[in-house]
Structure formats: C-alpha cells, structure tokens
Amino acid sequence: MSEAQETDVVVVGAGISGLAAAEALAGAGSDVVVLEARSRTGGRLLSTPEGLDLGASWGWDGEARVLTLARRLGVATYAQHLAGDTVVEDLGGVLRHPGNLIDVPAHRYAGGAAGLTDALARRLPAGSLLLEHPVDRVVVGAGGRLEVGARGRRWRARHVVLALPPSVAVDTVDLPDLPGAVARLAATVPVWMGQVAKVVAVYDEPFWRHAGLAGAAASRLGPLQEVHDLSGPGGDPAAIFGFAPAALLGPDAEAQVRAQLGRLFGPRGAEPRSLTIADWSRERWTSPADAAARPADRSRYGHPLLSAPALDGRLHWASTETATSYAGHVEGALAAAGRAVDAITG
C-alpha cells in the first residue's frame, strides 16, 4: 500500500451531498479529496441523455437550499405537469378520477436533476475527484487523524465526510473505531428509495394530455403503484414514470410494465419508444444486498447519533437519511452536507 497522502478532508461519495460539501469546503480553503465508488458522479441523481430522471426528480415549495443551488449553478427549473384527471386501478378495473389526486405543486430540473451534480463536480479543484475509488477502510491513525483506504491508496485527513447512506457505509467500509451503538444504528437505517425501481417510458408525444389525463395513476395491482408525467418542458420529451417495489419485478418486468401502461392509458401506453427500468435495490453503492430483510423504519432518519460527528468530531455523516428535516429529499441531502461543513469549518 502506498504512503498516505495528507489532506484536510476526505469526502466519501460524489452524490449531491458529497459534492455540495466538497465544493463548500474547497471554497472555504480546505484541501479536499472526493472518493466515489462508481464510474460516475450523482449517486441517486441519475438522468438519461434526454434529461429524464431515473432517480431523484422533484423539488418542493419551501425547499430553499436546492432552489438556491439550482439558481447559483444556472440549472433551470420548471413546474411538474399536474393538469388533468387521474387513472385509478384496483381489482374492479380501471377508473378515471376527476382531477389529479397527487396535486402538490412541485418543480423539476431542465435537463434532469443530474445537472446539479454535474455542475458541482465541474466546480471542484482539478484532480480532487476520483471515480472508481470505493473506500474500504477508515481508521483512527497517528495524532487522531483519520486514515482512509481506497484501491490500495491511502489518505490521512483531519476530517472524513461519509456522504452515502449509513447502512451502505457500514456494509462496505471497515470502520473498526466507530462506536458499536453508532454502527448498529447505521445498519438499521433504511436507504431512501433503496428498495424501489423507477420505470421511465418515453413516447413520441404526451398523448395522455390530449385525452385530458394528467399522466398520473395509482394502482393496487402493479407492478407500478404510483405513476406521474415525467415530460420535459412543453411536453418534450414526452414521458411517464412509475415507482414499483423492486421485489415485485420479475424477469418479465418489461412485459409487465408495458401491459400495465396499456391498461392505464390505452394501447398507445403499451408501446413506448423506449422503456428504462432503474432498479435501485440492485445498486451495490445504493442499497445493501440484504436490505429487503431489514426493517424499513424511517423514524431513524436524522437520529442524533447520525446527525452529530463521531470519532472525536472527525467523522461526519452527510446523506439525506441523516438530515433532521427533509430527510429523503435532495433538500435533506443538502441540509446534511451543510451541517457537516459547518462542523468542520466552525
């Protein structure tokens, strides 16, 4: 193993929380290294080349951090399409419900939410972001500094920011000095959307709008249980997306989804020009392999043991699951990142 490289802060994970923390810390004068296991940035922010989100997509009224960030980065927002009726599916068949049952105003990001993380990554100092560097060990070293290992390399840092879900952190990183109570808690914190598949169907036009439908649906039959319009500004590109419990998707998932979209929206619904299934439960760096067998207790989000630094104030949790407000949202990820930055710079 190589000699340890000295740095101020190592950030583990290049999702929205990790990149936001790294940009802020670098801007405050800290020497920062960002280590990302995947071959891309973004984490659970992932968009197709057409700008359609396979991960986080929405922002909501009152979420000031993400709106401020989008404006600062020059990422435009637009309103989620809500106009039209909802389709409801249960054992009795498919019914059309007047109005949109899911009518909470929300906004999306032109070009996809991954535009936020792409822009943040571009703002980091050259050479500070290392992809395909899964961290395998964080230990307390000489002088109380934390030693971080990844791909046979080592870094020695004053602080480490764990910007990945707590259960993934304790599942993939050797943390021998972490107090047992913290490690046990982290292992039980469910990953937001970690057992969900997001399905995106793209069409030549938003034909459902012409029929007075919102592109929204609720189903008790599945596999998609909740469906929304995912179209870009002005309906271009035209798309619908739905959430499905990953456990309900079998080897014939694509055929299942096409059949359901046909039931919900008619023959044209069953014939998208493309269909993408993003099963987040199969992402090693998003969800532990045995996560489906763990209790999904979201009351543990923002737990005091995970919203406070560990290891004498040197190890900081910064994923959305550790946020004390807006946990699960991009806003929560930014709040957690900001908390870590304040603890390090304050």
Regions found by a protein language model. Give the residues of each.
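Central beta-strand plus flanking loop segment that forms part of the substrate or channel wall
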Residues: 181-210
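Glycine-rich FAD pyrophosphate-binding loop
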Residues: 26-49
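Short beta-strand to alpha-helix junction loop
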Residues: 57-64, 101-119, 253
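A short alpha-helix-loop-beta-strand transition element characteristic
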Residues: 67-87, 206-215, 270
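Short hydrophobic core segments
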Residues: 10-12, 35, 154-169
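Flavin (primarily FAD) binding-site architecture
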Residues: 162-182
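A conserved short coil-to-beta-strand element within the FAD-binding core of flavoproteins
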Residues: 131-146
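Conserved flavin/dinucleotide-binding core of flavoenzymes
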Residues: 2-4, 8, 19-20, 28, ...
